Structures are given as C-alpha cells and as structure tokens.
C-alpha cells in the first residue's frame, strides 16, 4: 500500500508542475522510490536516497533550489527546526515543505531520544516544530493522516535569508519546552485538516493561477 504522504507529495508535484524534489531522511526508500519527480535528491547518513551524508552537511554544500522538500530525518525538535530553516533557503517561491510525525498518537511516541524498544511509530519531538512554523503566520496546515503531516507553502519571497533572522527563531526557546499534554489541550485550535480538504484548496488555487496567467482574472480578485 502506498503511504498517504507519498500520494500527497505526488499530488503537489503534479498539480503545480513541480520538477525538483528533495527528501531529508530516506531510510529504506519507502517514500523516495515512489515519488514521481523529474529530479530527485535524497539525503540520509545511513541508507536510502542518493547522498550518504547528514542534512547539515548537505545544506552546507548544496547549490540547488527545490519545489518540494520532505523532512523526515532526525526526529529531535532542534534538528527538525534546523532542517526546516535550511530548507527555506533552498525552496522556490510557491514551493512546498512537507514534515512528518507532527501528531504522535501518545506521549510515549513523542519523546527523544527514541526508545530502543519496538514501539512504533517513533515520532520523537518533531511535533514541537509546528509551533515554530505557526509563529511565521504563513500558509501552514497539519494533515490528519499517518502520524500528522505538516504542509508549509512558501508564498512570500521575503522569508528567505539567514535562518537566524527568521521570525520563528525567536520562538525556539519557548517551543522546545512545550509538554505533549499541552499540545493535546490546544489541539482543537491547531490548523488540522484532512488531506482531501488540502488537495481541494490546492486545486482551486491552481485554477486561479491559470486564470491569472491567461489574463482572465485580476491578481487581486477574490
């Protein structure tokens, strides 16, 4: 069975005619091998993908821009946040970043370091990054599938630059201390939707873009 995250990523690639895809954390290529992109780069220090290196080392030498980036590497909050910040600097305007494991099923799945037992899924503290991203006040949803799939779309060219200047950097100290129980308390206030709802929104947006490109709709029309 093809994972939902694969279907969502392929939908984005097809819907917006994206070509360049980056995956951080490939493991056994369950996702990577099923992604239908013209150009794919997969980064993992142990197995899978196309490059055997850490994401930090990759971003130090990378010169490419990407349309879609999927972050599913180290599941410690500070590393996920660093991967997100670095990804922003190599994401094209209008591009999309997907993040995995933002809705752990219980507090036992939401800890880091990951336990050495067979407890699955192993979400770590990835979920805390949602609060950093929400602080940006940009387009961001959490899809209620698998263990929570975050979807951030960059519509703002001014978000780029040195990661230390991003608004989210000011929230890092706060978000890293948020307990899992607190997240559960405010869960109903989070932008959590179903995948089909997000896909419908993206379809409407793409139609609008095409009408604007053809001069059939003003850019400020709503």
Residue ranges, per PLM feature:
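A short alpha-helical cap/connector motif
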Residues: 1-70, 74-98, 102-222
